[in-house]
C-alpha cells in the first residue's frame, strides 16, 4: 500500500487513531508550523462558549489574526458537516482571513475561503474551488503563507 492508501505509512505522522478526526488534522498542522520555523501563536477554541466560532485562532508574527475551521472527510461524501452556526459565523466574517481546511480520504489538504461556507455545506467541496490544495509531502510554508499571512 502507498502512503495515500494507508495513513499509518504516511510521512506526516499524527497520533494513532486520530488520522480521521479533526484533532489529528490539528496535530498535523501544528507539526507543520513547528517545521516551518515561524513563530505563530495558536489557540484551539472551544465552540461551546460561542457556537460557530472556528476551531483555531492563529496570530502571525505581525499580530494579524486568522481563523481555521477544521474538517475531515471520512467517507466518499463531498459535502461538509458545517453547522448552521459555523456557516453564519463564517458568512458574517466574510472578507476576514477565515478559512475552512479540509483533509480528505486521499490525505490531501484543501483550503477554502471561509466566505464559501454555505456553498460548501449545501453543494459540497467539489462544487467550490479551493484556494489551494496541498498533497503529501505538505508544503507548510505555502500553507501558512495562505492561512496565516504576515
Q: Which residue ranges define each predicted feature?
A:
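Acidic-basic catalytic patches of nuclease active cores, encompassing PD-(D/E)XK
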Residues: 1-47, 61, 150
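Charged phosphate-binding loop/patch that engages nucleotide di/tri-phosphates or the phosphate backbone
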Residues: 2, 6-13, 127-150
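Hydrophobic/aromatic beta-strand patches that form the interior of the parallel beta-sheet core
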Residues: 43, 68, 99-101
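Beta-rich catalytic cores
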Residues: 52
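Conserved catalytic cores of phosphodiester-cleaving nucleases, focusing on short active-site segments
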Residues: 56-58, 64-75
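Mg2+/Mn2+-dependent nuclease catalytic core
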Residues: 73-93
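Sequence/structural signature of beta-propeller domains
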Residues: 80, 116-123
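Nucleic-acid nuclease catalytic cores
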Residues: 91-118
